[in-house]
């Protein structure tokens, strides 16, 4: 598991939380738009409360990088503010005082995921203030052919090794 953040302070906070929880996490200072990690090196990429703090074009660039980082069949999972709730409650946008929250609220994480190449895109409400969005990097035709004779998901995942997660 690798945690990535642009903020050195948040990396220190995350390291302390991981230590207290007894988790072995490698934390890296870096930019989610250009991580420097090799292509297809992660099975899962997550982003938590990131996109409402970025301009939409930056969010789209980050999603393109997530797509690049994922193996075929890999999944991106995004937890962020509920866009539908934010669109319907202007007062809530004013409370957060985030410079890009209005643009985020008017956008669509689903559309951004689709434009980045993700399939099976789905967003679900998580309570009334958050949403969880998911997308899958489509399987390559070669990987589909390799998996045709497998009888269970366990067989497919056994070959994947140890999945890694990037927290942005």
Residue ranges and their predicted role:
Residues 116-168:
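Core SAM-dependent methyltransferase catalytic element
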Residues 1-34, 61:
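Class I SAM-dependent methyltransferase SAM/SAH-binding core
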Residues 60, 75-134:
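C-terminal alpha-helical "lid/dimerization" subdomain adjacent to the S-adenosyl-L-methionine
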Residues 23, 40, 116:
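Structured loop/turn residues at beta-strand edges in well-structured enzyme cores
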Residues 3, 43, 78:
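Conserved SAM-binding loop
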Residues 60-72:
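A short glycine-rich, Lys/Arg-flanked "PGG" loop and its adjoining helix->strand segment in the class I
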Residues 33-45:
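A short acidic, Gly/Pro-enriched loop at the edge of an enzyme's catalytic core
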Residues 43-57:
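A short SAM/SAH-binding and catalytic strip from SAM-dependent methyltransferases
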């Amino acid at each position: 598991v690798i945690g990535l953040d642009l903020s050195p302070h948040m990396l220190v906070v995350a390291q302390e939380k991981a230590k207290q929880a007894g988790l072995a996490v490698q934390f890296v200072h870096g930019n989610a738009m250009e991580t420097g990690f090799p292509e297809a090196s992660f099975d899962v990429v997550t982003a938590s409360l990131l996109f409402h703090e970025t301009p939409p074009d930056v969010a789209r660039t980050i999603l393109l990088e997530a797509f690049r980082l994922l193996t075929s069949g890999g999944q991106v999972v995004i937890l962020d503010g509920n866009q539908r709730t934010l669109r319907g409650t202007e007062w809530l946008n004013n409370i957060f005082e985030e410079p890009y929250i209005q643009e985020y609220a008017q956008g669509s994480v689903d559309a951004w995921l689709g434009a980045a190449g993700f399939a099976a895109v789905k967003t679900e409400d998580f309570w009334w203030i958050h949403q969880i969005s998911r997308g899958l990097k489509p399987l390559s035709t070669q990987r589909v052919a390799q998996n045709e004779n497998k009888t269970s998901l366990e067989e497919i995942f056994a070959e994947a090794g140890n999945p890694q997660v990037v927290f942005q």
